[in-house]
């Protein structure tokens, strides 16, 4: 059961990491298109990072 929990947490971390990378890429693209307001993404990225680190603590 513990192995399944660790596998699930690892999978969640991978998905959170992918989401963070995607948000960062969108933010980078907005440098080319400053008229697009993506300020809400900064908050979303912070939330994802927090979740990522909480999961890391659970794995330890």
What are these regions (language model features)?
Residues 1-34, 51, 56:
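N-terminal acidic leader/helix
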Residues 10, 35-46:
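Short, charged, amphipathic alpha-helical segments
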């Amino acid at each position: 059961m513990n192995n399944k929990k660790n596998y699930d947490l690892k999978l969640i971390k991978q998905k959170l990491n992918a989401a963070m990378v995607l948000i960062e890429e969108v933010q980078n693209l907005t440098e080319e298109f400053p008229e697009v307001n993506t300020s809400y993404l900064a908050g979303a990225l912070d939330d994802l990072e927090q979740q990522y680190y909480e999961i890391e603590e659970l794995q330890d």
